[in-house]
Amino acid sequence: MQLARIRRRVARWLAPEYEQELRETRRRLRTARRRLRKARAELEDARRYPPVFPEPLPERVAQTIEAVRGERLTYLKAGMLEDLAGCVLRLERDGVAGVVVEAGTALGGSAIVLAAAKAPERPMKVYDVFGQIPPPSERDGADVHRRYETIAAGAAKGPGGETYYGYRDDLYREVEESFARHGVPVGEHGVELVRGLFEDTIRLDEPVAFAHLDGDWYESTMTCLARLAPLLVSGGRIVLDDYYTWSGCRRAVDEYFADREGFRFERRTRLHVVRD
């Protein structure tokens, strides 16, 4: 053991760049192992539940998913977009009434998929600041604050490494144009883009059939849950985009549903909350 330590010290002294490379390799290996554990856990969770919508996606919806990913309008993988589309297609198949909501849309890709999956007459509201997201609070963990430091420093990147959506000059216009380009124009397809902070804009008084929440932090997630969960119809779903990603979102969800009955959790690739 002593000889091995001496050898390592000599190696560090003779080749410091080798030691730095070794540390970086070990760091990457640890990261890869964490990702593998997470992927395995997500796969096990997904196996516990049948697909929300077991039928093949309509061709138009499948093409929309491919198109928004091709244009890098979303951070979501194809399977996640298929899951969102399936939730809405099931509502249409089963005749479940209610508005479709997306809170936090970034470049609009997932909202465009939801709009393509729903009937044109079903109302849909898309809430976002359409700019840089607000800062986290003391209820968020260190992971969230580190992420926001990156965003605030101007170092965040878009889905393909391009300009981060929060730095765009006129994101609202870009999202509106993307809806039209993909065949679901806002004014003609029952979609309304609502600009502003969630606490100022989410004030519905009608049944909610489905909500995709992508608010990242604690306060935004808690606001969405407090305003939308009581309106969720029987069989309706809330999909939490960031439950497995950011501590603030996870804390808000766990706190909100801790003493509330009538909801069940489905731990799929993302958390689904279903109203009984």
Region spans (language model):
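S-adenosylmethionine/decaboxylated-SAM
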Residues: 57-78, 85, 93-276
